[in-house]
Amino acid sequence: MTTIPKPVTRIACFRFKSSVTPEQKGDRARAFLGLYRQHQDLIVAMPVGGKPLNTPLNLTNVKRDSVWDLGFIVSFKSEEARQQFDKEDGHGKLKEETDPLLEQVFVYDFEEEENLGW
């Protein structure tokens, strides 16, 4: 019996250094989209995302990190596709160009699971 590969969803958020200009942030966003455009065979659809909204949470004793500059979600066709994307030369080059501009990165990859995995 053959198993159907599960899509892998990636959530990525970026906090740029304070010295990074809006133009540089826009350039990095275009670079990310360009890389995904080159590898549409590995993804379900192009990434979606944007700048954060200032949504009040009103949670007790919960710290909220509100200084992200950019975030997006993308779904890969499978774990194999995600691994292939991460190994692409263009991905490595993009990281080399972008990492010096970043203060912090959050990347969370997951396969959809019943009851959120628990």
Kindly label every feature range from the protein language model:
Residues M1-L70, K77-Q84, F110-W118:
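Short S/T/G/P-rich N-terminal loop/turn motif that feeds into the first structured element of a domain
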Residues I73, R82-Q104:
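Short, compact, well-ordered microdomains
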